[in-house]
C-alpha cells in the first residue's frame, strides 16, 4: 500500500531472471495516470521519500526536454547518469520518444575527460547530461564539433564562460517533479548563474 488508497506490486530488477513468465508482451492498457516509476529523494531534508511518478509525468517532461535540447531521430544521446538517479530517465526516454540513438557511457571513461572527449567525437554525440561539477569540467575540455547541448544539474553551477560550440544548460528540479522543472541556457559569464524559468508543461 502506498498511502494513496492504491496498491501496487513491486519487483526488483535482480528478481526478473527468476520469474517464470511468458516472454511475449502482455496485452495491457496503460493509462496516463498509471504509475510509471517510484524514485527516492536524496534525503537532504531528512529521510528519503518515495516519489510516485505517472506515465503522463515522464511523457510531459520528455516532450519539453527534447524540444529544449533539439533532440530528434538524428540525435545521439548519452546515458551518463546512474540508473537510480532521475536524470537517467531524461536520457533514456528522450531517445525513446524521439527515435534518437542512445549511447551508454562505460564506467571507465566517465571521469576520463580525454577519453570521454574522444568518445564524443568518434560517435558524434549531440546531447548529454552530467552532474554539475563533472559537466563544469567537461564543458571546458570538450572539443567535439558534434555536441549541441550539455545539460548539467544536481547542485549549484559555478561561474563559467559559455562554450562557443555548444549550448550549456543549467537545470534544476526536485525528484517529485520529474527530473527538472527549470532550465537556464548559459549565454554569458555570470557570478551567480540562475536556474532559469519553468519549462513547458510544468
Model-identified regions with their sequence ranges:
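Motif- and composition-driven signal specific to adenylation
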Residues: 24-202
Amino acid at each position: 500500500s502506498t498511502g494513496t488508497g492504491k496498491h501496487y506490486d513491486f519487483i526488483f530488477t535482480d528478481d526478473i531472471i527468476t520469474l517464470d513468465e511468458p516472454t511475449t508482451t502482455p496485452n495491457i492498457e496503460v493509462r496516463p495516470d498509471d504509475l510509471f516509476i517510484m524514485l527516492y529523494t536524496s534525503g537532504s531534508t531528512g529521510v528519503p521519500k518515495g516519489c510516485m511518478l505517472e506515465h503522463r509525468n515522464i511523457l510531459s517532461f520528455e516532450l519539453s526536454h527534447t524540444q529544449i535540447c533539439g533532440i530528434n531521430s538524428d540525435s545521439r544521446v548519452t546515458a551518463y547518469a546512474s540508473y537510480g538517479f532521475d536524470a537517467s530517465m531524461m536520457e533514456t526516454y528522450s531517445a525513446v520518444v524521439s527515435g534518437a540513438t542512445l549511447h551508454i557511457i562505460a564506467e571507465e571513461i566517465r571521469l576520463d575527460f580525454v577519453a570521454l572527449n574522444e568518445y564524443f567525437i568518434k560517435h558524434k554525440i549531440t546531447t548529454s547530461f552530467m552532474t554539475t561539477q563533472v559537466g563544469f569540467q567537461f564543458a571546458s575540455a570538450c572539443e567535439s564539433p558534434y555536441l549541441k547541448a550539455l545539460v548539467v544539474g544536481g547542485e549549484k553551477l559555478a561561474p563559467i564562460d559559455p562554450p562557443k560550440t555548444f549550448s550549456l544548460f543549467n537545470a534544476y528540479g526536485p525528484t517529485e517533479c520529474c527530473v527538472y522543472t527549470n532550465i537556464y541556457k548559459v549565454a554569458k559569464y555570470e557570478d551567480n548563474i540562475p536556474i532559469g524559468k519553468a519549462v513547458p508543461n510544468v
